[in-house]
């Protein structure tokens, strides 16, 4: 798994000295923003890269959740004033995946409502089991991909009707006219235009990835006139990771590990993910 590498020397960047360490220019994710990573049987790490292992978990369980949990924690709590509060409604893309399953549990623990977006009924029911208030099967809608040209009235009009139909599916859960306070985004290209539209006035679309593509499009008018916030988010600070880990130690968040692969089966695990045939939740490689 990726490990978080914190700066080891004093920096002139104020964000490293009492500000947000994730905004420090020296901050890099080991193996993602550096040439060499931790994808090996053995790696040597620094003391500040470690968090306490929950005593009730196996090593496999303990090794499978931190990347997605800490990322989800920062997305939901790291960008004030748009932080998770009780009774909020949060739309969670990919609810049965790594980020989504962690987000659902954090949202549930906060007394808020997670609405999972999934691709099958089976995955939706699993999201309900871990704490989602409800789920929406995205295969019942056809509003995915880049935003059609707003100058093409026919194409844009048809697209907007479908997005509004998706929005009404949200209202069936939250109540008429009640849009998500936060949209938990990571697919990117295929879903971002919809996220920017369905988020409530003054709400936030927070995203940490572009798993379906990096070319994000949206109708700017709905963002500026309704004063919505589009917020990028990248992993987590040590403090945020520690706080997230305590939610596991306290039993409020489960690691959700479904399969364990031997090290030589890594190609199989990657193939399953590439084909979207993996079981819901986390994997662990030993």
Regions found by a protein language model. Give the residues of each.
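NAD(P)H cofactor-binding loop motif with strongest signal on the N-terminal glycine-rich segment
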Residues: 94-95, 187
């Amino acid at each position: 798994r990726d490990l978080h590498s914190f700066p080891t020397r004093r920096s002139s960047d104020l964000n490293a000295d009492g500000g947000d360490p994730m905004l420090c220019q020296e901050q890099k994710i080991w193996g993602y923003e550096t040439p060499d990573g931790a994808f090996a049987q053995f790696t040597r790490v620094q003391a500040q890269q470690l968090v306490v292992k929950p005593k009730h978990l196996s090593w496999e369980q303990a090794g499978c959740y931190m990347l997605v949990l800490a990322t989800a924690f920062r997305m939901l709590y790291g960008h004030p004033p748009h932080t998770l509060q009780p009774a909020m409604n949060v739309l969670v893309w990919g609810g049965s995946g790594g980020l989504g399953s962690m987000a659902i549990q954090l949202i549930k623990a906060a007394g808020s409502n997670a609405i999972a977006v999934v691709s099958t009924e089976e995955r939706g029911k699993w999201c309900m089991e871990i704490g989602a208030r409800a789920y929406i099967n995205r295969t019942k809608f056809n509003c995915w991909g880049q935003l059609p040209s707003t100058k093409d009235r026919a194409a844009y009009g048809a697209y907007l009707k479908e997005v509004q139909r998706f929005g009404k599916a949200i209202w069936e859960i939250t109540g008429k006219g009640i849009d998500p306070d936060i949209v938990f985004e990571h697919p990117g290209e295929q879903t971002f235009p919809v996220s920017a539209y369905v988020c409530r006035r003054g709400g936030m679309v927070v995203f940490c990835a572009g798993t379906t593509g990096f070319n994000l499009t949206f109708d700017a008018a709905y963002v500026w006139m309704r004063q919505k916030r589009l917020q990028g988010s990248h992993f987590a600070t040590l403090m945020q990771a520690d706080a997230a880990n305590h939610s596991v130690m306290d039993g409020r968040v489960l690691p959700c590990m479904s399969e364990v692969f031997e090290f030589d089966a890594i190609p199989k695990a990657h193939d399953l993910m590439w084909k979207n045939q993996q079981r819901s939740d986390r994997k662990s490689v030993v």
